[in-house]
UniProtKB/Swiss-Prot annotation:
This is Tyrosine--tRNA ligase. It catalyses: tRNA(Tyr) + L-tyrosine + ATP = L-tyrosyl-tRNA(Tyr) + AMP + diphosphate + H(+). A motif ('HIGH' region) lies at residues 39-48. One of its GO terms (biological process) is tyrosyl-tRNA aminoacylation. L-tyrosine binds at Y34, Y169, Q173. Its main location: cytoplasm. The gene is tyrS. A motif ('KMSKS' region) lies at residues 229-233. It comes from Streptococcus pyogenes serotype M12 (strain MGAS2096). The lineage of its organism: Bacteria, Bacillati, Bacillota, Bacilli, Lactobacillales.
Amino acid sequence: MNIFEELKARGLVFQTTDEQALVKALTEGQVSYYTGYDPTADSLHLGHLVAILTSRRLQLAGHKPYALVGGATGLIGDPSFKDAERSLQTKETVLEWSDKIKGQLSTFLDFENGDNKAELVNNYDWFSQISFIDFLRDVGKYFTVNYMMSKDSVKKRIETGISYTEFAYQIMQGYDFYELNDKHNVTLQIGGSDQWGNMTAGTELLRKKADKTGHVMTVPLITDSTGKKFGKSEGNAVWLDADKTSPYEMYQFWLNVMDDDAVRFLKIFTFLSLDEIAEIETQFNAARHERLAQKTLAREVVTLVHGEEAYKQALNITEQLFAGNIKNLSANELKQGLSNVPNYHVQSEDSLNLVDMLVTAGISPSKRQAREDVQNGAIYINGDRVQDLDYQLSNDDKIDDQLTVIRRGKKKYAVLTY
């Protein structure tokens, strides 16, 4: 099975400009290719991971990746299938975000070894050197307004309005392809299926300005089995930065993937062989309640993104919280595992009587209910049941001198911080 056949078997090929020519190029020699990442935030997220891992698969097959950080295009904003104009960021912010994204990409691509080691480029380096007049004369003249307006990504915005700034975005992305082809012999661009219009602007410019053929391959935008856009948890993006989405939160995200999606996602998001995945699928279908596919997915992706130690920690947090063994976890581990539960910062004037604190921290709705909860054995401090109405919280209840975990019943948690 050649690399293109494997990508197809994994469900990673959505569209290509000329499949036969692309397969020929990929099987006959080394292809230089690029994927672009606009710094629209200070971190990449799961939505980017499909293209990143596809790029890594091609590198493992001997081809040479260029990772383009859009320091210039990030200043403009991509209108593709967006309902409204993006807010423009300052140059300083975009350049700072660009540096962070560069660091994240080095986790996945090999920038050190071999003749196909990855290269990092930033389109701010060339766009900052081109005058507006030169850009219009040397690039803009190759694009008709009719051609630009025919793009689906632009059509959707015509009625609601699109600025010239965003309208020109596709020409800038097209010029990226031309520049990388001219300087580095890059002949293939990879990106999400929503980028098709912008990406083919590059092949158009190559054809008209340099009489060369470029290839485009899009990867699918991933949705779950209900059709919902994939990569968000409770409406929030799942970030690759551990400070924005902890390894534990990412682990839980994958653990909660629906059965109908789990095997498909193993093909897309892991480097397990297709034979290994087929074996997992057989075992998974025989005992779905054991969630083997989800557990494997969580292990593989968290290890890939954050490393084996982070995976082991996420697994330990999961197991200890499930068993109620709060004291077996550090304060930092508890912050990860209980990041979504109510948090109350204890004030110096607060009463440390347990009944009072249950009401103050919002764990019990009233003192009467709080007393009943304590007497009925429904209150746990750091996993230990407390039934003393006169119990006073003390330093002994602080884990690592930072926090106390109170549980009411089986599932209602609150974290007291000091």
